[in-house]
């Protein structure tokens, strides 16, 4: 009976020593947090392993995360994953539909973004910019011929339209001359002609019937206007005037002293033509509603795909610039030692307990062997 008791006692003592040894070893990973001094000499194993190697641990964890976890290939693969693209697209689409239920004007949106008096400031900026740019254009181009300022496409179109302009002019002239107003105008011109020539005019009026003579001039005028030679002459005149206009420099048409006034006038006309009150006070949703399906079905998926593809393509540069290793190291360094201990215990508390129990089991087994050997010796 004493033999069995001795063996059991040795087992209990060995188990206790083994369990306590492992428990103390585990605690020494974290404790003490600071070095302990005795007679001005630091005691061994103080501070604990993790507090002592905290900076090195943070640095190595950062390197491991970047080298083996958040690698360039892993990030690129995740960004190009179809499931991620679908989830991001669905999230943005949902947010878009939620915003479409609201009534938000550009003024309100810019106000939320911290841009006060958006309408007034935007119009003022546009007005200043337009006037500056128009003035700069007039100044830098004042020695340039109009042919260089007019776009070639517009120049070609205007040149092609000259015969049509001629037809338009002759047509309008024919209509006017053939009208009653034209007849009256011709008669008044004849009367004025006779009056301006004094006695000779008075004598001519004695032999000429103004009404019949006016009708004759009206008829001959219509014949003259509708002749091809007349149309050709008008067309040649228009062409010549057009070429003369193109050959002129800008400063001939707009003298330097009038450029500032013209710039201000053009700016004022443009600003008045812009419906800024409607633009800034009309709900954005009303403008977008006609394109809602196109935005959700085409634009958002396309934008998400392009965005993720861009980030994936430049993932190496982004990771390098973000310096994830340093970021992880910095974040770990901000943890207090109790927080690190709590984090490790929460993650591997069960395993740490099993190590303690294993120490007790091994200690007990060794105690049994020691008890048996003690009986034999």
Swiss-Prot record:
Main location: membrane
Record's bilayer topology term: Multi-pass membrane protein
UniProt KW Cell membrane keyword: yes
Transmembrane segments: 1-21, 357-377
Gene Ontology CC terms: plasma membrane
InterPro entries (alphabetical): DUF445 (IPR007383), UCP032178 (IPR016991)
Top-level taxonomic group: Bacteria
Keywords from the UniProt entry: Cell membrane, Membrane, Transmembrane, Transmembrane helix
Compartments where found: Cell membrane
A Pfam family annotated for this UniProt entry: DUF445
UniProt keyword annotation of Transmembrane helix present: yes
Family stated for the protein in its record: Belongs to the UPF0754 family.
UniProt protein name: UPF0754 membrane protein lin2327
Originating organism: Listeria innocua serovar 6a (strain ATCC BAA-680 / CLIP 11262)
